Amino acid sequence: MGAVTISVVALESADRIELPGGSWSRMLVTQDRVGGNASSLGYSVFKPGSATTSVSHEVEEVAYVVSGSGRLDTGDGEVRFRGGDALHIPSGTWHAVVNDSDSDVVMVFGFPHPDYPPTERR
């Protein structure tokens, strides 16, 4: 068996991606950062009262809500979530993250794609 390379990526080392309402995201595991990966991982903080643009990814998305509560607005209504919940968003599903609470929502998310996947926005 060949040598295994394990990558460690510090949150602060990834570029901050600004989102609406003071929210932000960082892509931690990507092809540029670790290379040879088949999946990607990111970290987001959604500020109280914020809402993202509605997006649809070419691949499924999974997420874990570390803390806070809010909802996903989808084409079929809304889905509530809170800290400790895991989310599975099928590919092609339109969704927006809405923090309708008075505290931050912290979420870790991933895709079966080596980078942030091709995405439509509306």
Identify what each model region corresponds to.
Residues 1-38, 119-122:
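A short, N-terminal "cap"/entry segment at the start of jelly-roll beta-barrel domains
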Residues 41-44, 88, 103-120:
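A short hydrophobic beta-strand segment most commonly corresponding to one strand
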Residues 76-92:
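Short acidic-glycine-tyrosine-enriched beta hairpin
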Residues 34, 102-103:
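Short strand-connecting beta-turns/loops that link adjacent beta-strands
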Residues 58, 77, 93-94, 103:
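A generic "binding-loop/recognition-motif" signal
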Residues 58-70, 75:
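Glycine- and acidic-residue-biased ligand/ion/polar-headgroup-sensing regions
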Residues 25-30, 41-57, 91:
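Conserved short histidine dyad/triad with adjacent acidic residue
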Residues 52-54, 72-73, 89, 95-101:
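Short beta-strand His + acidic residue motifs that chelate non-heme Fe in jelly-roll/DSBH
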